[in-house]
Regions:
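Flavin-binding catalytic cores
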Residues: 119, 299-300, 333-336, 370-409
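Helical element adjacent to the flavin cofactor pocket in flavoenzyme catalytic cores
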Residues: 203-244
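A glycine-rich dinucleotide-binding beta-alpha-beta segment and adjacent secondary-structure elements
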Residues: 173-190, 336-341, 388-452
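Extreme N-terminal leader/targeting segments of oxidoreductases
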Residues: 1-7, 25-26, 207, 425-426, ...
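N-terminal glycine-rich phosphate/pyrophosphate-binding loop and immediately adjacent elements
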Residues: 3-133, 420
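Mid-domain catalytic core of redox enzymes
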Residues: 235, 241-353
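Rossmann-like flavin
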Residues: 95-194
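A conserved FAD-binding loop/helix module that cradles the flavin
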Residues: 447-470
């Protein structure tokens, strides 16, 4: 396709591609410009350690994949996407060889939680059953007219609670509290923050509703399928093309930017209305991530073998330990025992490594922009629950916050969330209004995870922004 274009999308991450696909489905001529040599943003796979070992650069487990209303309606399997479902979505080891598992089956999970099983069912069963209605409400801007008010109210009354408050109300056993802490800590918020429970509620409900699957072959498989579908619709993706100024773009009726607020300020500058520019200037980043990838000569030697039943493992010990880790990060300190999110893809997808070998993906939260190397402390947490792990390491890759940003400009300071996900910035993302994607400049839209519904690989930020453009510009 050659100019003229109807719409230009800046950034070929999942939200940018979702925006482009939505526009192309409506008959618009669309081109996507991507600074990196490969599309995907945080949804890419790279040989980070040794040849033949395929590691996910960013997102590695996809609870929103089959649950996203946008992804679910696309024929991505036609382009090679296949979801692999582990035996269990999640494992959480504890000291003494114990472990608690989140099973796809709510019944099996309840059975493993002893005296907390009934309370767990009472908390999660309504969200699991009502997920399609809840998704319709929470995966769009906060300011809207609800269609499913009872389901939204039931979810919202729990979601508004801080992580600790919900734990104290719902659970008594160390196992149930630890399972909740590990999932809720995906929010990267202090456990005292209002609204922090929303992330854990959604993620655990999705674990029961659709699982936490991984794409066969790596995260790149999802990106490649999205690109292929866009091209089948007549769209185009141009990689290796950095956009530094809107004035350098071809003429188009609409520009949708899958970029950080900081980049939008650089691109649009004084074109933006003062109130919107002020909102972007005041945007607060979340904490950063420090990421390790490993090539192993065998599987992780877990003390509790049930940990090998899940692709995702949360390492951090008890509720109180994980709470302390997230508090330290929020206060600008490096945790002594960090909360570690780990994925062991090759147990379920051996195509990602040479025969008999394995990959491990792991990261921990650190203060924004931290330059402290915490490789040893992350490895110590793995070794704590899998003695002998270090002996199986062939090679490792270290991506500190600065390296993450070099790989993906949207990860400013190593923040993988598109900005803090506290209650204020979930509501005003980046502005509180019915259409938070419109910038105030006709035809210019923000469509990154710094817009509703925020972080996660679901494509809904791009989809919602494209619908706004179709209504306002092409309607």
């Amino acid at each position: 396709m050659n100019p003229p274009y109807d719409a230009i999308v800046i950034g070929a991450g999942p939200n940018g591609l979702a925006a482009a696909i939505t526009l192309a489905e409506a008959g618009q001529r669309v081109v996507v410009f991507e600074a990196n040599e490969t599309a995907g943003g945080g949804v890419r796979s790279l040989e980070l350690t040794e040849p033949g070992f395929r590691h996910d650069f960013g997102a590695a487990v996809f609870p929103f994949g089959p649950a996203s209303p946008f992804f679910r309606r696309l024929p991505l399997e036609r382009y090679g996407l296949r979801w692999v479902h582990p035996d269990a979505p999640l494992a959480h080891p504890l000291d003494g060889g114990r472990a608690v598992l989140l099973y796809r089956s709510l019944k099996d999970t309840v059975a493993g939680l002893g005296s907390d099983g009934g309370r767990y069912r009472q908390l999660f069963e309504p969200a699991v059953d009502a997920w399609p209605k809840i998704a319709e409400e929470v995966l769009q801007p906060l300011v809207h007219l609800p269609r499913h008010l009872p389901a939204l109210a039931s979810f919202g009354l729990r979601a508004i609670l801080p992580i600790r408050a919900l734990a104290d109300l719902a659970f008594r056993t160390e196992e149930a509290r630890a399972l909740w802490a590990g999932t809720a800590a995906h929010a990267a918020l202090p456990f005292s923050a209002p609204g922090g429970s929303s992330f854990g509620l959604v993620l655990q409900a999705l674990g029961h509703r659709v699982g936490w699957p991984i794409p066969a072959g790596g995260a790149q498989s999802l990106t490649d399928a999205l690109v292929a579908h866009l091209e089948a619709l007549g769209g185009e993706v141009v990689t290796g093309t950095r956009v530094d100024d809107l004035s350098g773009l071809p003429n188009a009726d609409a520009v949708l930017a899958d970029v950080s607020p900081r980049t939008m300020l650089r691109l649009a500058g004084d074109l933006l209305p003062a109130s919107y520019r002020k909102a972007l200037e005041g945007w607060r980043r979340g904490p950063a991530s420090f990421k390790l990838d490993f090539a192993l000569d065998g599987p992780i030697p877990w003390t509790n073998p049930d940990c090998a039943r899940a692709a995702t493992v949360h390492l951090g010990g008890t509720f109180e330990e994980i709470e302390a880790s997230e508090r330290a990060t929020a206060e600008g300190r490096i945790p002594d025992r960090p909360y570690v999110l780990l994925a062991q893809h090759t147990l379920f997808d051996p195509s990602r490594a040479p025969e008999g070998k394995h990959t491990v993906w792991a990261y921990a939260h650190v203060p924004l922009g931290s330059a402290v190397d915490i490789s040893d402390t992350i490895e110590a947490q793995i070794e704590r629950f899998a003695p002998g792990f270090r002996d199986r390491v062939i090679a490792r890759s270290v991506l500190d916050p600065a390296a993450l940003q070099r790989h993906d400009a949207n990860l400013v300071g190593g923040d993988i969330f598109g900005g803090s996900q506290d209650l204020v910035q979930l509501a005003a993302r980046p502005v509180l209004r019915p259409d938070p994607y419109a910038t105030g400049v006709r035809g210019l839209y923000l469509c990154s995870s710094s817009t509703p519904p925020g972080g996660g690989v679901h494509g809904m930020c791009g989809y919602n922004a494209a619908r706004s453009a179709l209504r306002d510009v092409f309607g």
